[in-house]
Amino acid sequence: MRITFNDVKTSLGITESYDIVNAIRNSQGDSFKSYVPLATADNVAEVGAGILINQTVQNDFITSLVDRIGLVVIRQVSLNNPLKKFKKGQIPLGRTIEEIYTDITKEKQYDAEEAEHKVFEREMPNVKTLFHERNRQGFYHQTIQDDSLKTAFVSWGNFESFVSSIINAIYNSAEVDEYEYMKLLVDNYYSKGLFTTVKIDEPTSSTGALTEFVKKMRATARKLTLPQGSRDWNSMAVRTRSYMEDLHLIIDADLEAELDVDVLAKAFNMNRTDFLGNVTVIDGFASTGLEAVLVDKDWFMVYDNLHKMETVRNPRGLYWNYYYHVWQTLSVSRSANAVAFVSGDVPAVTQVIVSPNIAAVKQGGKQQFTAYVRATDGKDHKVVWSVEGGSTGTAITGDGLLSVSGNEENQLTVKATVDIGTEDKPNLVVGEAVVSIRPNNASGGAQA
C-alpha cells in the first residue's frame, strides 16, 4: 500500500520531481522567490541552499509541501482500501445524516358508506428514519527533522524519497485504519444479528460444498432483484429490491481462490469484467463462520467529514510536527439489502423485526403490529406478543393488535418474542417497538 513518487507526480499532473518545488515557489511571495531560484534538473543544491537560508523560507516551504501538496496527493492517489469504493463522498458541514425510507402502503377495501365520513381521514405514510452521526475524529502525527530537510537537497532522488516518506507515513496509517473500520461495520452488523443469514456448509471443505454455495448465492441474488421487492433481506423489513449490477460480494482471499470467477459471473448474469468490479476481496472476517456477505451498494453509509493537514514548527527541538486530521461518518443503512452466508452453528432465528418499530397511538386507540422472523432453518416459529409499561386496560392480542387504554399516559414497549431454546433452557430472540401516547383530542393517525 506504499505510494511511489510516480503516484505523486501523476496526482499532481507533473513530470519532474523539481516541478513540486516550482509549484510551491509559484504560490509564494517575492521574498521566497528571491531566495529560491526556479528549479531545474541541474540546480538542486542551489535550490536547497535557498530554502535552507533562513527559518521563514523553510517554514513556508514545509507548510506548503505538507499542508497543500501532501493533501492533494492523498486525495488523488489510487485507492488502496478495497472497501473505499463504497464511500458516499464528502459532507463537510454538520455531524448528522438523516436517512428516510417510505415503505409501501396497505390496500383498503372499497366501502361506499365509509367513504362519506372518511374521505378526509389522514393516512400517515409508513416512514422509517435513521440518523447516522459522525463517529470518527482522529489524527495522525509525524515529525520532520531539520537534518531530513537538508539531506533532501543532496539530489533530486533524495528529494523524491523525502516527499514520498512524508506522504506515506500518514497515508498508509489512515488507509489501513479506514479499511479496518469499514470491515468492522460488517462484523458488528453480523454480531448484532442484523444480516439476513443464509446457512451453508464451509465452502472450502469440498467441491460439493463450493457448488452448493454458488447455487445458494445465485438463488439469493435472484430473490433480491425480483421486481416486486421483498421484506426478507434487510433488517428493517421494508419492502425493497436491489438491481443485479448494484449487488456486491465481499469475500476473503481464501474463498475467492477456490471460486471460479466465470461461474460466479454467470450466477449474477453479468460478464466477467463487470462482475469483477462487484467482488471485493478482503483478508478475512473477524466473525467465526462468516464466509461472505452480499450487500446492496447503498448498504455502506460512509462519508468523509474532514481531511485536513496542519503543520507547526518547534524551534526548541529543531523540527516540524505535522498532523493529518480525518473525521468520518462510518455507518450502514438498515433499509438496504444485506445477506450473510454463514457456515457452522447458526441460530434457528437470528432476528425478530417488529413493524412499525415506532408508533404514536391515541388514548383509547389501536395499532396493528407485524413480526418478521428471520429464520435460517426454513421453519415457522411461534411469536409471542407482549406490551410493557402500560396501565390497566392496555393490552395486545396474540396476532399483534395493540389496544391502548383511554387513560394511558405512559410510553409503551411492544415486544415480539420467539423462543428457539428448549423447555428447560429457553433462548429468546426479541424484537421491539416503541409506542408514544397522544391525548385523545390530538389530530393525525398512528405513525411508523
UniProtKB/Swiss-Prot annotation:
Its main location: virion. It holds the Pfam family Big_2. GO terms for cellular component: T=3 icosahedral viral capsid. Residues 104-127 form a coiled coil. Keywords: Capsid protein, Coiled coil, Late protein, T=3 icosahedral capsid protein, Virion. SMART domains: BID_2 (SM00635). It is found in: Virion. Residues 348-425 form the BIG2 domain. Assembles to form a prolate capsid shell of about 54 nm in length and 45 nm in width, with a T=3, Q=5 symmetry. Homohexamer. Homopentamer. The prolate capsid is composed of pentamers and hexamers of the capsid protein. Belongs to the phi29likevirus major capsid protein family. This is Major capsid protein. It comes from Bacillus phage PZA (Bacteriophage PZA).
